[in-house]
Amino acid sequence: MSLNQLKAPRGANRAKKRVGRGQGSGLGKTAGRGGKGQKARSGNMHFEGFEGGQMPLQRRLPKFGFHNIFRRELEEVKVGDLQGLSGVVDPAALKSAGLVRGNRDGVVVLAGGELSSALTVKVHRVTAGARATIEKAGGKVELIPAPQTMHQKAKAAKKAAAQAK
């Protein structure tokens, strides 16, 4: 077999849709655009949410809320998910166990499920119910400081540069 003998499999290349070429094609006269109206014209500009000139819903409703750029997004782990682990449980151990991805601003342990083994849990945040469950099983909870956000790192670098002068 050589390059000049290569051929696309049957049905791989669809024929170009030829519109407006007679009734027999099924796409004659209006070319599949239906009757008259804005959508039948060329360059039919209308944006998503356009209501024919009526004030659209997204503009009729008032704005509310905001997105806090300093918000910390924590990865959640339930106490019951820690059941298979042993010894010291920290974010690195949780990542290797596949319980967290490790791409957020820290880890929070939530109540939910049972725990039978004593664990030392080192996380960024823990709920009261989760702490009670861990300590009831004979374990202990240690809070570790949250990793710095990009904003905090930039601020610290700026402060260090100012003090170095």
UniProtKB/Swiss-Prot annotation:
Keywords: Ribonucleoprotein, Ribosomal protein, RNA-binding, rRNA-binding
Pfam families, per the entry: Ribosomal_L27A
Stretches for region Disordered: 1-44
GO molecular function: rRNA binding; structural constituent of ribosome
GO CC aspect terms: cytosolic large ribosomal subunit
Protein's GO biological process: translation
UniProt feature, compositional bias: Gly residues: 21-37
InterPro entries cross-referenced by the UniProt entry: Ribosomal_uL15 (IPR030878), Ribosomal_uL15/eL18 (IPR021131), Ribosomal_uL15/eL18_sf (IPR036227), Ribosomal_uL15_bac-type (IPR005749)
Gene3D superfamilies: 3.100.10.10
Subunit organization: Part of the 50S ribosomal subunit.
HAMAP family (alphabetical): Ribosomal_uL15
Function in brief: Binds to the 23S rRNA.
Family, as annotated: Belongs to the universal ribosomal protein uL15 family.
Protein name stated in the entry: Large ribosomal subunit protein uL15
